[in-house]
């Protein structure tokens, strides 16, 4: 078959294996973390299922997988690293589990087909540019527990019309909603008395 198998190891006998089927479904199993840039630029991949036991996803692991449409991330993963799914322009669906605590810089940058995202209550920090250039994003749910939004986190989200900011938020970066042309309503439950206009949008 066209199935492939590969083992990544961090030198401590922690291995990750994968199978890639003819229809582009990538199934990842084992224990430990997926290596940085492990599948970067692989245009054969159309869907990713990560099994429980995997605890980390390396920086840029799936960046530029332009035919990837859906991703399932298991309970146990705590961080989505920088540029993990950056420039996955066909990605429409991603499930973020309740064990993730941080989403790092540009993790979903330029995922231009992504239409909605739910950030679970476990996430306390969303890095700079995480959803920048997600031009089809219309629905975002930010849960209570989130404390930080980075610079330009939702920059160029041209389809985003409304968003609610939870009371737990204490820090918001510059131009968090820069160039969100259709954004008409920001409902803020946090104490925003010290925030300047540049923190939100231009």
Regions found by a protein language model. Name each.
Residues 11-12, 24-25, 82, 151:
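Intrinsic-disorder/low-complexity loop/linker signature
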Residues 21-32, 43-56, 66-79, 89-102, ...:
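Structural signature of tandem-repeat unit edges
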Residues 1-5, 178, 186:
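Short intrinsically disordered, low-complexity coil segments enriched in acidic
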Residues 13, 33-41, 201:
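A composition-driven surface/loop motif
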Residues 1-16, 22:
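Low-complexity, acidic Ser/Thr/Pro-rich repeat tracts that form intrinsically disordered stalk/linker regions
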Residues 2, 196-202:
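Membrane-proximal C-terminal cap and juxtamembrane stalk of leucine-rich repeat ectodomains
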Residues 37, 58-63, 81-86, 104-109, ...:
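Consensus positions within tandem repeat domains that build extended binding/scaffold surfaces
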Residues 17-18, 202:
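A general structural signal for short secondary-structure junctions and capping/turn motifs
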């Amino acid at each position: 078959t066209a199935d492939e198998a590969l083992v990544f190891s961090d030198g401590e006998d922690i291995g990750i294996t994968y199978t890639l089927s003819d229809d582009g479904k990538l199934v990842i199993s084992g224990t430990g973390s997926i290596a940085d840039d492990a599948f970067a630029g692989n245009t054969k991949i159309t869907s990713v299922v990560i099994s429980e036991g995997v605890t980390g996803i390396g920086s840029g692991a799936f960046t530029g997988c332009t035919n990837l449409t859906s991703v399932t991330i298991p309970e146990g993963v705590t961080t989505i690293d920088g540029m993990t799914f950056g420039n996955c322009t066909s990605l429409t669906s991603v499930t973020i589990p309740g064990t993730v605590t941080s989403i790092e810089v540009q993790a979903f940058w330029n995922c231009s087909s992504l239409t909605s995202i739910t950030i679970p209550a476990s996430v306390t920090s969303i890095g700079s540019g995480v959803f920048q250039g997600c031009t089809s994003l219309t629905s975002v749910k930010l849960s209570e527990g989130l404390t930080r939004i980075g610079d330009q986190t939702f920059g160029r989200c041209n389809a985003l019309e409304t968003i609610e900011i939870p009371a737990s938020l204490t820090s918001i970066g510059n131009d968090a909603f820069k160039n969100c042309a259709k954004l008409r309503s920001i409902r803020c439950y946090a104490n925003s008395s010290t925030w300047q206009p540049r923190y939100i949008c231009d």
